[in-house]
Amino acid sequence: MIAKTSTISHGANAIRYSVNKEKADIVKANLLPDNISPEAMYGRMMLVQRKFAENINKGRPLGRNVIRIEISPSEEESRGWTMNDWASLSNEFIRVFDSIDLSQKTKRASSKQTNLKGSQYIVALHRDSKSGILHLHIDANRVDMEGRINDSHKIGERAVMAANIINERRGWVQSEEIGIRHKQEISNCCMEIFLSLIHISEPT
C-alpha cells in the first residue's frame, strides 16, 4: 500500500471531485451529516474555521485549508473487500497518521500529532479509470473541532510512515519496495522501446 498527502487551497473542488466522480462510493463522513452535498460539506468545514478564526493563523484565513489524502492498496491486498473493509482501513490509517510524532524532525511542538479523528472529513472510494484498481480519497478539515490546526509540516512524510506501519502490521509490501518495482518496470519498458528502435533502424 502507498499513501500520499498534501494540504490544498482548492478544498471545495477536491471534495466535489471525491464525492461526484463517476462510480465513487462514500465510505464515511466524519463529524458531518450524511447525505449532504459536497458544497455543504466544505461549507461546514469553513464554518468551523471561521468560528476559531481569532485563534488560528493570527485571524487570517488559512490559504491551504484542507488536507488531501490518497490511500492505495495493491489489487492483491484489497481483493474481495467490502465497504466495511475500506472503512476499517480508513479508520486505521487516520489513527496511525494522528499518532506519529514528528516534533523532533520539525523542531515544532505542533508536529507532535495531528487530530484528524477529531476533525471533519469525508472518505470516498474511487476506481482508477484505466486499471480499475480501487483507492481511497480523504478530504479533511485543517482545523479540528476544538479549533486546533492540524500541522502540515512534513505531512507527506507522515503519510508514508503511516502507510509503512500498516503495511508492516498487515504483512503488505512496503511503499519503498513498490517504488523500486515501479522504477524497474519503467526501466524495462524503456529498454524494450530502445531495442525495438534499434531493430527498426537496422538496414534490411
List each language-model region with its residue ranges.
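N-terminal nicking endonuclease/strand-transfer module with a His-rich metal-binding environment
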Residues: 1-197, 201
